[in-house]
Structure formats: structure tokens, C-alpha cells
Swiss-Prot record:
The active site is at E218, K350, D426, H524. Residues 84-124 are annotated as: Linker. This is 3-hydroxy-3-methylglutaryl-coenzyme A reductase 1. Keywords: Endoplasmic reticulum, Glycoprotein, Isoprene biosynthesis, Membrane, NADP, Oxidoreductase, Transmembrane, Transmembrane helix. GO terms for biological process: coenzyme A metabolic process; isoprenoid biosynthetic process; sterol biosynthetic process. Disulfide bonds: none annotated. The chain crosses the membrane at residues 63-83, 496-516. It is a multi-pass membrane protein. Pathway: Metabolic intermediate biosynthesis; (R)-mevalonate biosynthesis; (R)-mevalonate from acetyl-CoA: step 3/3. Its EC number is 1.1.1.34. It catalyses: (R)-mevalonate + 2 NADP(+) + CoA = (3S)-3-hydroxy-3-methylglutaryl-CoA + 2 NADPH + 2 H(+). One of its GO terms (cellular component) is peroxisomal membrane. The lineage of its organism: Eukaryota, Viridiplantae, Streptophyta, Embryophyta, Tracheophyta. Residues 105-114 have a biased composition (Low complexity).
Length: 539
């Protein structure tokens, strides 16, 4: 670092040099300070004794005592008053290697960057990038040291280029609010990824029209859902039912024996104890309200599945805090209970599981529509009979042959993922949110088609997570579900879940029609980029 500059880097080095003068003492600082204190105390006591003996004349000893006391006072005053005096630390070091009690110059440490005027804030970009690239400055501390999230991301990006030797020019940087994502969406950002957003619709659902935003790179997907929306709207619309609303978290605990674990299971599931446990759970949030507790036993390990409503939030953090409250209470009642993990996979999050398929997680929704026979022929280019037969052979029997778990559908995850990314949901939760069974039946003497999708685990929220980002907030606003519903907490998240199910209904209808009519490959060759890529490669 060039100390000739007038920036913070020069001041840090200068302070370190001044601090070295304190380290030049012949004895360690701790011993020197102790000797000074002892000298001050002894000389003071000696002077008090001499003052009480007024008849004794002053001699060499008395003068030596006075000089010793004055020297001790001057030393200690200079030690405590000097701004560059070293501080002795006893806490853990930043790198986790605690226990060190060595005296070190406080001024030689980088100044905190939470406010203006810190040394790192005034250092130039080149110094900071070099420090990050060399490992002297951890990349994850740039935001806190600089106090400027945008600058931190820009310098991290440059340091990444130097370390890897590869540029990221194609990765956009401008246009992102890096302050908004701090502590909420992403750590150590260097830019953001662009995804095209298409709009399908209008989807006529429960008497209201929705234009559905979908972020995807799969050609033909938005067009297919749009055709399904057109068929549904032309037939009078779709209707949805919310069956259940409860996010779950299942901690894993261990007890000394299976018998003792069974006792805890009985206690947690006893109706007489529910109000007590609910009161403990509900302390964590204004909106989180415990709905039920269901337990599973494996040897002496117990898995307690807590389910609660979470307002307009998806609710994972909310339910986790409530679970911690209950675990603290249960440890008083069962002191031999050992908490292994706040999540024991019986929840079950981001995994296709039978418990979610049967019990549900998040919002459980059924959406249905009756498609007129003439619409099936004119819009979908097929027949009711072919669609019903295809659904049985493909979605039901075919999925059973494959051993599917909640995958009795054509492509529900396509629509769920595209909607999740567009509206700021957790894309990884499309695993359980896409669990869906699609049913098709002939009605009205075979003239019309009844289609439904049953989705037991749609995990969505309209506040928190990625919903704070400008693009995702705009998509939520397009659907009329942005933010929390103050008049009816939870209403926006519930409506978003029904929109997801309605969009899946449209996507299922259109894809099955394309398969039944033999148009799938042709439509993908028309709308998918693969044909263009092949043409480029051939030329």
C-alpha cells in the first residue's frame, strides 16, 4: 500500500508505526503496566506513612518515593490518554482462532466501515481489489467494510476477473438495487442473470381475469399456456378451492429410549396440551398460528411436524422460530430430550415426499374447468375422447409404471417454476410445489371435458425473499397480489396459490392436446431455439 497518499491507507500505516513505539519497551506491555501500578500503590502508602510521622526529617528515601510516585503517575496517564496506545484483546479473532491474548495495536486493525470516514472507504478501488484478489480482505466483508453495496459488488466483480482470468462482461451489473438484496436475497453479488418474461392469458379464474407472467428460457411454453388460457376462458373460466393452508417444520429430537420418545409423542399430540403448546409457539409472530402437531417415531428418535398458517409470507422462518420456542419449553418438561436439528426432513422441504403428497404443505389447492366440446375441437385441435384416453395412459398409468411420487401430470413443474421465478418465490421449492395429479373426464354425455389439477403443496408468499426485487414485485403487482393484504392477512398469498394452480391447469390442457393431436414436435420446432442453433452450426 502506498503510504504517500493522503487516504485512509496511509493513516492506517502511520498509526501502526506510532503504535510500534509502545512495543519497543524492554518488557512486555502487560508486565510494564503491572510494575507501574505496584510502584504507584507502594509509593503512595509510604508517603501516607511518612506524612503521619511529622517529626521525621525528609531524606533521600523520601525524595526517591516522591520521584517513583510521580513517574508511575506520568506513565499511567500517558498510557490511558494516548490515542495510539495498544489495547489488549482477549476475545476470539475474526478468523475463528480464539484464545489469543497477545497485545496488538488497535489502530493497525482496519477501521469499521459502517460509517463515513473509515480508512477502507477512502482507500482507492485498486487497493481494495488487490486485497480481495490476494485474500488479505475477505470478499464477503466488502459490504460491511465499504458501507456501499453497489461499490462492493463492482469491486468483487473485478477481483473475480483477476483471480479466474475470465471476464464476466455478459453478466449485467447496472439496474440492480444491491442494497435491497443485502441480508435478504443473495450474498457476495457480482451481477444478476437476465431471463425473458412472457405473459400468458387472460386466465379467467374465479370470475377474475389474470395476465400470468412467466420467466422461462423454454420456447413454446408461454404460447402453450396461453392457448390453454384461451380454451378455459372460452368455456366460462376455471374455479379453484383452497383446501388447506399450513406451512410445516419438523425438528428431530433424540431421547434415551424408544419408550421415552413415545411418551413425548403422546404429550405433543395430546389434545389437552395443544392450547399450551400453541400459546408458546404463537409468541414468535403476529401472523403465525399453530394448526396441528403430528409425530413420527424411528427408534428413540422423534420427528414432530408442526404446521401453522403464516399470513402472506411463505413462512419458513416464521414456523422455524415458533418451533424453537416449543422446543425450549419441551426441554423443561423432558430434560433428557436432545435436540438434533430444527429440521429433521419430515417437514419436508425441497424434496418429493409422501408426507407432503398426503398431508400437504403450504397451500393445498384444487382447480377445475369444464371445456366445451367445440372449444376442444377448434382451439385445442383434438377430441374429448382422445384427451381422456391420453391422460389415463400417460399421466396415471405411465406415472405409476415410473414409480412417480406426486408426478401424475404432464408438466406441472414447467409452469410452477416459470411463475416462481417471475414472482420472486424460492425456485427450489418447485420440487414439492409441482406435485400434482391431473384428472380428465367426459361429461355431458361425452360432449364436454372436465379437467382438474389437485396440488397439495404450493409454497408461495407475497412478502419476504425475492418478492422485494423490483422485477418480481412488478409481476406480483400485475397479478394484483403485491405485498401483504392488510384487510385480510394471507389473502394475497392464497390467491397467488390459486393462480399457480389455474396456470398449471391451462398448461396441462394445452400440452395434452398437443400430444393427442401429434403437434408437439412441430410446435417446438417452430418456437424453440434449437432449430436456429442447428442452422447456425450447419453454416
Amino acid at each position: 500500500m502506498d503510504v504517500r497518499r493522503g487516504g485512509g491507507g496511509g493513516r492506517i500505516v502511520g498509526a501502526a508505526r506510532r503504535a510500534l513505539t509502545w512495543g519497543a519497551l524492554p518488557l512486555p506491555m502487560r508486565i510494564t503496566n503491572g510494575l507501574a501500578m505496584v510502584s504507584l500503590v507502594l509509593s503512595s502508602c509510604d508517603l501516607l506513612r511518612l506524612c503521619s510521622d511529622r517529626e521525621r526529617p525528609l531524606g533521600g528515601r523520601e525524595f526517591a518515593t516522591v520521584v517513583c510516585q510521580l513517574a508511575s503517575v506520568v506513565y499511567l496517564l500517558s498510557l490511558f490518554a494516548h490515542p495510539d496506545a495498544p489495547a489488549t484483546t482477549t476475545g476470539d479473532d475474526d478468523d475463528g482462532q480464539g484464545g489469543s491474548r497477545r497485545a496488538r495495536p488497535a489502530a493497525a486493525e482496519p477501521a469499521p466501515m459502517h460509517g463515513h470516514g473509515g480508512g477502507m472507504m477512502e482507500a482507492d478501488d485498486e487497493e481494495i481489489v488487490a486485497a480481495v484478489a490476494s485474500g488479505a480482505l475477505p470478499s464477503h466483508r466488502l459490504e460491511s467494510r465499504l458501507g456501499d453495496c453497489r461499490r462492493a459488488a463492482r469491486l468483487r466483480r473485478e477481483a473475480l476477473r483477476r483471480v479466474t482470468g475470465r471476464g464476466v462482461e455478459g453478466l449485467p451489473f447496472d439496474g440492480m438495487d444491491y442494497q435491497a438484496i443485502l441480508g435478504q436475497c443473495c450474498e457476495m453479488p457480482v451481477g444478476y442473470v437476465q431471463l425473458p418474461v412472457g405473459v400468458a392469458g387472460p386466465l379467467l379464474l374465479d370470475g377474475r381475469e389474470y395476465h400470468v407472467p412467466m420467466a422461462t428460457t423454454e420456447g413454446c411454453l408461454v404460447a402453450s399456456v396461453n392457448r390453454g388460457c384461451r380454451a378455459i376462458s372460452a368455456s366460462g373460466g376455471a374455479f379453484s378451492v383452497l383446501l388447506r393452508d399450513a406451512m410445516s417444520r419438523a425438528p428431530a429430537v433424540k431421547l434415551p429410549s424408544a419408550m421415552r420418545a413415545a411418551e413425548l409423542k403422546a404429550f405433543a399430540e395430546a389434545p389437552a396440551n395443544f392450547e399450551l403448546l400453541a400459546a408458546v409457539f404463537n409468541r414468535s409472530s403476529r401472523f403465525g398460528r399453530l394448526q396441528d402437531i403430528r409425530c413420527a417415531l424411528a427408534g428413540r428418535n422423534l420427528y414432530m411436524r408442526f404446521s401453522c398458517i403464516t399470513g402472506d409470507a411463505m413462512g419458513m422462518n416464521m414456523v422455524s422460530k415458533g418451533v424453537e420456542n416449543v422446543l425450549g419449553y419441551l426441554q423443561n418438561v423432558f430434560p433428557d430430550m436432545d435436540v438434533i436439528s430444527v429440521s429433521g426432513n419430515y417437514c419436508s422441504d425441497k424434496k418429493p415426499t409422501a408426507v407432503n403428497w398426503i398431508e400437504g404443505r403450504g397451500k393445498s389447492v384444487v382447480c377445475e374447468a369444464i371445456i366445451k366440446g367445440d372449444v376442444v375441437q377448434k382451439v385445442l385441435k383434438t377430441t374429448v375422447e382422445k384427451l381422456v384416453e391420453l391422460n389415463i395412459i400417460k399421466n396415471l398409468a405411465g406415472s405409476a409404471v415410473a414409480g412417480a411420487l406426486g408426478g401424475f401430470n404432464a408438466h406441472a413443474s414447467n409452469i410452477v417454476t416459470a411463475l416462481f421465478i417471475a414472482t420472486g418465490q424460492d425456485p427450489a421449492q418447485n420440487v414439492e410445489s409441482s406435485q400434482c395429479i391431473t384428472m380428465l373426464e367426459e361429461v355431458d354425455d361425452g360432449d364436454d371435458l372436465h379437467i382438474s389439477v389437485t396440488m397439495p403443496s404450493i409454497e408461495v408468499g407475497t412478502i419476504g425473499g425475492g418478492t422485494c426485487l423490483a422485477s418480481q414485485a412488478a409481476c406480483l403487482n400485475l397479478l394484483g397480489v403485491k405485498g401483504s393484504n392488510h384487510g385480510s392477512p394471507g389473502a394475497n398469498a392464497k390467491r397467488l396459490a390459486t393462480i399457480v394452480a389455474g396456470s398449471v391447469l391451462a398448461g396441462e390442457l394445452s400440452l395434452l392436446a398437443a400430444l393427442a393431436s401429434g403437434h408437439l414436435v412441430k410446435s417446438h420446432m417452430m418456437y424453440n431455439r434449437s432449430s436456429k442453433d442447428v442452422a447456425k452450426a450447419a453454416s
